[in-house]
Amino acid sequence: DNITGCNKPVFTGTTAPEAEVTLTIGGKTYSTKADVNGRWNITVSDPLPEGSNPYTVQATASNGASGTLQGGVVIDTQAQEITVSLSSASDTGVKGDFITQVTTPTFNGTAEAGARLTLAIGSSVYTFAADASGRWSFTLPEQLQDGVHQYTLTATDIAGNISTGTGSVTI
């Protein structure tokens, strides 16, 4: 997917044995020599900016034959804010107060598009995902007893960045 939470990524590949390999990215050029099996890696030493970073890799074999590969890597080092609320059908008291008479409430909110979410409430942990627009909705499959229930919502985006929110719902 070429998305990473590291702004100094390591590029790896395979080419002709002992070929000279250059990587151009972020206005800098990095070089290395492939090993006897053709394996190589280059660590970008200067931090790349957030967002899309095009790159070019060129390999030149000892016989002069060369090849070029172009691509891009997306740097995403920042976790996006997450929101959580009770759905309008579950929010039976004053809107937004997280007090409800619904024992299997539906939570909804926003996170980064495609983020993996984990809701921990009581001794249960549930995993689900945000859609392509970053919206998510989850209905508890098990009834909550009357009282205050603490929850933790964790979102992990595709680059591995983590956002966490905590709160409580009262039944």
How does the language model describe each region?
Residues 7-11, 103-107:
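Structural beta-strand segments of beta-rich domains
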Residues 38-42, 134-138:
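Short strand-edge motifs at loop-to-beta-strand transitions and within beta-strands
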Residues 67-87, 91, 157, 163-171:
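Flexible, low-complexity linkers/stalks enriched in Thr/Pro that connect modular domains
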Residues 1-4, 80-100:
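Short, solvent-exposed loop/edge segments of extracellular or virion-exposed proteins
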Residues 44-52, 140-148:
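Surface-exposed, short loops/turns at beta-strand junctions within beta-sandwich domains
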Residues 14-20, 110-116:
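Short proline/glycine-enriched turn/loop motifs at strand-loop junctions of beta-rich domains
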